[in-house]
Design a protein with these regions (language model features):
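Extracellular carbohydrate-recognition regions
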Residues: 114-128, 244-286
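Short beta-strands within extracellular/lumenal beta-sheet-rich domains
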Residues: 83-85, 143-168, 207-211
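Trp/Gly-enriched beta-strand surface patches
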Residues: 2-91, 283
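Non-catalytic C-terminal accessory modules of carbohydrate-active enzymes
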Residues: 648-654, 668-671, 675-676, 682-802
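Short Pro-Gly-centered flexible turn/kink motifs
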Residues: 87-103, 287
Length: 802
């Protein structure tokens, strides 16, 4: 038997389908169909209706005593359903009953940045801290605060204001956090009908103190106006503890008797604060956003019009779909590559079948970084995380190309700034935060990769103007003096900004310049300026940033075009009195300086997996990777101190630390996450080591990683970072190329092979087909099992073989 609660819709019905049942949603002809391939099936369409555990108790009795309940569908809510298949088996006989699942829910309430619920941000009552789906909120006083994220996330908008008060004290102090746009998410002081003071958050959920000097407004009447007119990421505002005082140093958490508390939001209502009509003020933003669907609709909602169509398609095509799936599986597992590598690659392909990935109605791909238990983790196909993921561009190249199209046509503005996260449904995001240096520069390399994988030069040509604008923005923003390296503060995958040149992001810069030059040459575009930058950057990387063993960071925060770090917007980058002291002694928070960073040459790995030559000295790159293995790989972590997220690897676990300081120089506050272990970084280092001929060192890292995910403590098919099925883990796919050097170039029809393990047999997937590739007794052997792969020549370790 197969038995299930009615989990689709608590108020939905259960109806019949041939040899099974449908958990029906409240929408017409949609839901989940569950049915078997046996005509003898008997269906209980409605479990016992009762309270508490009554339904489960009765159905379990039926199961354990072998009773078959035959019950027709009922009107109204049904708590669950069962399908039974009576069987008679002789001793030693087996029979298989296939259970089919067909899912069709064409609509959702999921949106990030696109849907707008006008005037609903401040309904109900003040928030009791952190709202559902929100990062932890801290820094407020008492048990409640004003939090416009509370009742629906960033999609809610509204305005709330205080009663009018007389300005008789010198200062107004309060706490603020959340979004940072003065015209969209802010706390404002209104005097004589005009906004005279404004405070915003710093794109962090930690509230910080703001002080307004009221001397110019003494004797006048005023009110506080809090606005949330933004539906994009960080489209919310946090505020708490509004206090009038004559003491600028008033302790806002322990008020004196001479202060006046204007609002603390500790009651079960807004009290005398009033929600006001925001519709007029929102018109300008509504006009800017254009016509975008309010909520996400999946791709299949356009292909199929009903659940019955899905069932019909599955019944007609399941044999073909299973056959092709087995072709893939058989080809993949026929490989002779090390077992730990195959396991790491295969296990992480589950990410592509997890809730981490979505495909909207028009076919465009969109993804979270990972998944929390009940919602997505970190939205928007984040460029600096999906940089690492190498499975999708090879297995489903056309889907990967939609990511590039979104990045350069939707997420990029006219200045070339890319938001590294995009809305859902896909639409133009705001440009109210830093671009991500590694994400934006990595995207340029990935345009080159998608061109070589697809062979579609016209596609590359169409994107090239936007790619140029993107690269020019990067140069103008992070290398304004054209030195060839990133000097100005640059945001990256560690959710912070590196100040001064570093190996990780400057290697991305060199890789992006290389990709742009190659594409420019193909299109006969001028690239002289970029070639000069590449030459200067290469020289600087190999000298100033190489300490003789590995690449480092030169921390710099003075003499830049950027303002003081205290004044620069940053996640969690606010500077307390203690942090200001550290700034003077060590420089900005969250740097790595002389550390040995596992990602310290990441841009060169990206270049290789994108089909580009690594422009840096090969021996220096190899030296860096060997140093990472030497210093950062730990075979147990008993003595390792990790104040961040130790659950990724702890105790007797082994793993590759993100950074160590073997030669001293560790900062008091190094970059966040530096003590952690991330599987995606383990795999990129391992595959890069393999490319450099250091196969055993690479396998050493892979073994430590997969031993943590052996099923005893952690799920072998769910490598976690900031969420389950975390996309960065698909860096594991790069190990196929790392061991074999196998890469197909569809532009010039060349199959590349550069084996680091002698003879081998490996899986190969291209835009037009998949199969296996062998290097055997000095000869390449290609076996295409699906589609076709048009190979004109082989390039074997740099030598052409027709």
């Amino acid at each position: 038997s197969y038995n299930t609660k009615n989990f689709i819709d608590g108020q939905g019905t259960i109806r019949g389908v041939k040899n099974g049942f449908v958990l029906e949603s409240d929408q017409n002809n949609s839901g989940l169909a569950i049915y078997v391939d046996n005509a003898a099936a008997v269906v209980d369409h409605c479990w016992f209706r009762g309270a508490w555990f009554d339904p489960q108790t009765v159905v379990w009795d039926n199961i354990r005593y072998g009773r078959i309940a035959d019950k027709r569908p009922v009107k109204g809510v049904a708590p669950g359903a069962s399908v039974y298949v009576p069987l008679t088996l002789q001793p030693g006989e087996t029979k298989t009953v296939k259970v089919n699942f067909c899912w069709y829910l064409p609509d959702s309430n999921l949106s990030i940045g696109g849907a707008r619920k006008v005037g609903q941000a401040f309904t109900g009552m003040p928030c009791k801290g952190t709202a559902s789906g929100q990062q932890p909120v801290s820094g407020f006083v008492g048990k409640q605060l004003l939090n416009s994220f509370d009742r629906g996330g960033d999609g809610l908008t509204g305005i709330i204001q205080s009663p009018e008060f007389n300005i008789g004290k010198r200062y107004l102090k309060f706490l603020v956090g959340g979004g940072s746009q003065a015209d969209r998410t802010s706390v404002n002081l209104v005097v004589d009908g005009k906004i005279v003071e404004t405070a915003v958050g710093n794109q962090t959920e930690t509230l910080s103190e703001t002080v307004w000097d009221l001397k110019p407004y003494q004797g006048k009447k005023a009110f506080v106006k809090v606005i949330d007119l933004d539906v994009y990421p960080w489209g919310h505002i946090l505020a708490d503890q509004f206090v009038l005082t004559d003491n600028r140093n008033e302790d806002i958490y322990n008020l004196s008797s001479t202060s006046t508390l204007l609002a603390d939001f500790e009651s079960n209502s807004w009290g005398d604060w009033q929600v006001v009509d925001s519709s007029e003020e929102e018109k300008q933003f509504l006009a800017d956003e254009g016509d975008v669907e309010a909520t996400y609709r999946p791709w299949y909602s356009e292909r199929f019009k009903s659940l019955n169509e899905v069932i019909g398609y599955w019944d007609a095509n399941q044999a073909m779909l299973e056959k092709n799936s087995r072709l893939f599986s058989d080809a993949f597992y026929s490989s002779s590559l090390p077992a730990e590598v195959l396991e790491a690659v295969a296990a992480n392909l589950t990410i592509l079948k997890s809730p981490t990935v979505l495909r909207q109605w028009d076919g465009r791909f969109w993804a979270w970084e990972g998944c929390q238990d009940s919602f997505g983790s970190c939205h928007g196909s984040c460029t600096h995380v999906w940089n690492y993921a190498q499975a999708l561009p090879h297995l489903f190249p056309s889907l990967e190309r939609t990511l590039r199209e979104t990045e350069f046509r939707v997420s990029q503005n006219t200045e070339g700034h890319q938001n590294f996260r995009v809305n859902l449904p896909i639409s133009a995001p705001p440009h109210n935060f830093h671009a991500a240096a590694d994400g934006q520069l990595g995207g340029i390399m990935k345009v080159y990769r998608e061109w070589r994988i697809s062979g579609d030069t016209q596609w590359m040509k169409d994107l090239f103007p936007a790619v140029k604008k993107s690269l020019d923005y990067c140069i103008r923003t992070w290398d304004p003096l054209h030195k060839g390296y990133l000097e100005e503060p640059h945001h990256n995958t560690y959710d912070i900004e590196f100040w001064g040149p570093d190996g990780m992001c400057t290697s991305f810069y060199l890789g992006a310049l290389t990709a742009f030059i190659e594409m420019g040459k193909e299109l006969k575009q001028p690239v002289k300026e970029y070639t000069a930058l590449l030459s200067k950057g290469k020289k600087y990387m190999e000298t100033a940033l190489f300490d003789g063993e590995y690449f480092i960071q030169k921390i710099q925060w003075e003499g830049l075009q950027a303002p003081n770090p205290v004044d620069v917007m940053s996640f969690g980058g606010s500077y307390s009195e203690e942090a200001l002291k550290l700034l003077k002694e060590e420089g900005p928070k969250y740097q790595y300086g002389t550390g040995c960073l596992s990602d310290g040459i990441l841009g060169m790995w990206m270049a290789s997996v994108c089909g580009l030559d690594e422009v840096l000295d090969n021996e220096k790159v190899r030296s860096h990777l060997v140093a990472v293995h030497k210093y950062n790989l730990k075979h147990d972590l008993i003595d390792h101190f990790n104040p961040q997220r130790p659950v990724y690897a702890c105790g007797k676990d082994g793993g590759l630390l993100l950074c160590t300081w073997p030669k001293g120089g560790m900062l008091s506050l190094p970059f966040v996450y530096s003590n952690e272990v991330w599987t995606g970084i383990e795999y990129q280092v391992a595959s890069h080591l393999m490319m450099k001929g250091e196969v055993e060192k690479g396998l050493d890292i892979v073994r430590e990683c997969r031993e943590r995910y052996d099923g005893r403590v952690r799920n072998p098919f769910n490598e976690i970072e900031c969420g389950h099925w975390y996309a960065r883990a698909m860096a594991s796919y790069g190990m196929l190329q790392g061991l074999t050097g196998v890469r197909y170039d569809a532009v010039d029809k060349t199959m590349y092979i550069d084996s680091k393990i002698g003879d081998f047999k490996s899986f190969i997937s291209t835009d037009t087909g998949f199969g296996t590739i062998e290097w055997k007794a000095g000869k390449p052997v290609l076996n295409v099992v699906y589609g076709n792969i048009d190979v004109k020549r082989y390039n074997v370790s740099g030598k052409i073989v027709d």
